[in-house]
Amino acid sequence: MAKRKEENFSSPKNAKRPRQEELEDFDKDGDEDECKGTTLTAAEVGIIESIHLKNFMCHSMLGPFKFGSNVNFVVGNNGSGKSAVLTALIVGLGGRAVATNRGSSLKGFVKDGQNSADISITLRNRGDDAFKASVYGNSILIQQHISIDGSRSYKLKSATGSVVSTRKEELIAILDHFNIQVDNPVSVLTQEMSKQFLQSKNEGDKYKFFMKATQLEQMKEDYSYIMETKERTKEQIHQGEERLTELKRQCVEKEERFQSIAGLSTMKTNLESLKHEMAWAVVNEIEKQLNAIRDNIKIGEDRAARLDRKMEEQQVRLNEAEQKYKDIQDKLEKISEETNARAPECMALKADVVAKKRAYNEAEVLYNRSLNEYKALKKDDEQLCKRIEELKKSTDQSLEPERLERQKKISWLKERVKAFQNQENSVNQEIEQFQQAIEKDKEEHGKIKREELDVKHALSYNQRQLKELKDSKTDRLKRFGPNVPALLEAIDDAYRQGHFTYKPVGPLGACIHLRDPELALAIESCLKGLLQAYCCHNHADERVLQALMKRFYLPGTSRPPIIVSEFRNEIYDVRHRAAYHPDFPTVLTALEIDNAVVANSLIDMRGIETVLLIKNNSVARAVMQSQKPPKNCREAFTADGDQVFAGRYYSSENTRPKFLSRDVDSEISDLENEVENKTAQILNLQQHLSALEKDIKHNEELLKRCQLHYKELKMKIRKNISEIRELENIEEHQSVDIATLEDEAQENKSKMKMVEEHMEQQKENMEHLKSLKIEAENKYDAIKFKINQLSELADPLKDELNLADSEVDNQKRGKRHYEEKQKEHLDTLNKKKRELDMKEKELEEKMSQARQICPERIEVEKSASILDKEINRLRQKIQAEHASHGDREEIMRQYQEARETYLDLDSKVRTLKKFIKLLGEIMEHRFKTYQQFRRCLTLRCKLYFDNLLSQRAYCGKMNFDHKNETLSISVQPGEGNKAAFNDMRALSGGERSFSTVCFILSLWSIAESPFRCLDEFDVYMDMVNRRIAMDLILKMADSQRFRQFILLTPQSMSSLPSSKLIRILRMSDPERGQTTLPFRPVTQEEDDDQR
């Protein structure tokens, strides 16, 4: 909507159409005095005289018809065209389609089947306030043509029918002049807009309704527009001031040019002097360049020397690393050789132990046999002696019955000996079985004991890992060692105290992040000890860091490695030497590294740009061991940590990542399961050991029983054999001489002596074999213990060997790094030296040229570029002076024009500044007036609303909150204080419609539009409320004859009082096929006659 004229925002005293309202009892406060005016008797401008519609909405032709100057009732049933008249009024006077609540686009108002619609509205244009009375005459005809595509065009015609304008701006000017507001709901209030307003719960919407109805909102927008204009003016002032600076500079230049006409010869002299200075200034600059190049060469040579020293130091460190690797390897080889050397001895000693045990057992058996034989001979001796005594005493021979009895007993004894011998063989077999079982159990016991020791070592390692992982949950740095957080804190303190040139970076594993967590083990297997390493800028920083590490790492324990390399802020460009494969990343690309020092150190020490990461083992073999491995790729690592070369494959000893895993909880859970499994495994092994020990003890007991039983059987056999012999001896010829028996006894004694001597020898041999057996067992246990010790020593040495191998690789890469840097530096240095030679030749040429221009060397303070600019500027001045020499009038004119332009703009800027200041004062005054005017309208609206409600004995409240922009309305339909105030939505349909009419009439009383339109104002009222509302409207219309009222209703209006000011426009129901609606005006008298 176009901006209103400034007069629209004046106070009520300066309103365009002053009038006086009949306030009756309202004039109780002093504020109403500001709102009084004069009364007009008839409307002269802005009211609607006639409307004519064609193909509009669902009507082919509607009208033409004329409205009265005061009260007009448009009556008719639904579908008769009442709403079409109101909609056409809004659209025809430039309103938007959405404001009608009948459609969202203008093309929706064109009747179906037609290409366009036409609206013609005639406005009254009489009296002193007429709009361009000489052009339009007493009326203005507004014709609007709406096309099917939604576009519209205007024709503004005079009273004679001639077209005055087709521009919408002219229509807006007319509406502004007549103060017609088609989008103001007080001027034109449709039934839908009224319903939306009454049902709104937002008090802010009601406040906006009030502001829009009273044009206060337009005034507020105009104030905002003025303030925006003020800010734009300030910006113009700022731009003008900048332009003033430029104009002043141009004016000064023109003045200098004007004054320089007389100094032409001086300028030529100055030009020659500047040329002399320029010649030697060029020499000075070349000399400075030469000095800078010499300085750079000297710095470069110093750096080359430093690089040589670093290469030597790197070579020393490489030699030390290789020596350390060789020493560890030698130790491992020595341990391996010693272990291998002791293996045959161990086997031999084991076999010797078995042989010694067997020999001892055999000797023990022989001894026992000799002992039994001795005992048998001793018994035989006793029996012979007894027999001799019996023979000596016997005087008579045995009888035959005795002999038969002896024969029978001999047979029984022989059968018994045979049974005992069978038992002896069976028990001997059991003894051998028990001895084998005991030997087997002892071997198994030793094997399980060693396995238990290995599992305990693994359990201890896992428990340490589990503790470190749990500590790392609260502090990730503890993954790299329990002392790392304290070491880093010490590094920070030392750096703050200035002990480091640059703060060391590390551990490197804490400075990198994985893009793919599945590659954690692969990257750890690749970087190994580098994950715990630290980077230092120089060897001085390294020495400080070594001193700090001594505080946290005990002597003899391994410390994190330290990499010494000059810190750089940019990562090396390794694109020319990096490995590439379309499907697999390198270690460098698989890592997120924010610190360039970390990336460069890993590139130098491990060559991570040349190492591929291939998750699948078989795919890694296929890629690396093919005929054409990837370019620049030295090796690859799999997700299991295996290392793959072109011709070799090494499996990883580790099964899980230690430093780079992100899922710490999962690792803790896995380790806890492993600890639990190993604890259970140790328990099972211990139970197995206990079971074996029980079996060994049980078998040894059974063996002892068998051996005891075996001895008992031997004794029984010997006893029975002795009895048999004794009985058989009795059977011999009884005539045997006693001397013979005595000879036999003597012979038996000799045998006993021999057996006893042999037994003593066997006993000594058995004791000797027993000592040999114990000695062999001790030797076997000692060498077994030594072999186990060697195995335990080899495990940490293997870890140290891996670290040493990584260190050797790192030092080799460091050496290559310094060699490459030295080569690049020497190339740059040689280039500088060639540049020096060229500059020296150039200096000789420039000095020769300078002597030709100025033989004697002069001191020059300005640079050649400044002198060159001054020479060019002076030449231009001289050329300009030559071109304008003698035309002093032209130079004078240019100077005067520049000066006048500057002064004119300066005057305008000063004027605008005064205007801004004055505008601020005016706006402050007008805003106060605006607030006073708003207060006046608010009070009048409250008074009118309360007075109108009192016609029905209602009470009402209107609470305005201008700060929060809210308006709350409450109505009490009862008498006095008997009923509570209610929101309008809580009222009945008739009460709400009546209250709505009162509110609208209150706004009508303070609004300035020349006409008011109200659609179906009484549709929800009962007869009593309709009568009262009608009386209120007619009373207001009678008091405001200078305004036009158009009221749309479906009621017949037969009860209206007789008045020439009232015109009823009755619309008939359209008949089937009818294209033109009869629309005729009826006066009150005609309506009464028809009834």
Curated annotation (Swiss-Prot):
Residues 22-34 have a biased composition (Acidic residues). InterPro entries: P-loop_NTPase, Rad50/SbcC_AAA. It is found in: Nucleus; Nucleus speckle; Chromosome; Nucleus, PML body. ATP binds at residues 76-83. Residues 1-34, 806-828, 1072-1091 are annotated as: Disordered. Keywords: ATP-binding, Chromosome, Coiled coil, DNA damage, DNA recombination, DNA repair, Isopeptide bond, Nucleotide-binding, Nucleus, Phosphoprotein, Telomere, Ubl conjugation. One of its GO terms (biological process) is telomere maintenance via recombination. Phosphorylated. GO terms for molecular function: ATP binding; ATP hydrolysis activity; damaged DNA binding; DNA secondary structure binding; single-stranded DNA binding; ubiquitin protein ligase binding. One of its GO terms (cellular component) is mitotic spindle pole. Residues 226-451, 660-914 form a coiled coil. Pfam families: AAA_23 (PF13476). Widely expressed. Strongly expressed in testis. There is a cross-link at residues 268, 773 (Glycyl lysine isopeptide (Lys-Gly) (interchain with G-Cter in SUMO2)). Residues 452-659 are annotated as: Flexible hinge. Residues 809-828 have a biased composition (Basic and acidic residues). The keyword Coiled coil applies. It comes from the Eukaryota. Forms a heterodimer with SMC5. Component of the SMC5-SMC6 complex which consists at least of SMC5, SMC6, NSMCE2, NSMCE1, NSMCE4A or EID3 and NSMCE3. Interacts with NSMCE1. Interacts with NSMCE2. Interacts with SLF1. Interacts with SLF2. Interacts with RAD18. Interacts with SIMC1. The flexible hinge domain, which separates the large intramolecular coiled coil regions, allows the heterotypic interaction with the corresponding domain of SMC5, forming a V-shaped heterodimer. Belongs to the SMC family. SMC6 subfamily. Core component of the SMC5-SMC6 complex, a complex involved in DNA double-strand breaks by homologous recombination. The complex may promote sister chromatid homologous recombination by recruiting the SMC1-SMC3 cohesin complex to double-strand breaks. The complex is required for telomere maintenance via recombination in ALT (alternative lengthening of telomeres) cell lines and mediates sumoylation of shelterin complex (telosome) components which is proposed to lead to shelterin complex disassembly in ALT-associated PML bodies (APBs). This is Structural maintenance of chromosomes protein 6. It comes from Homo sapiens (Human).
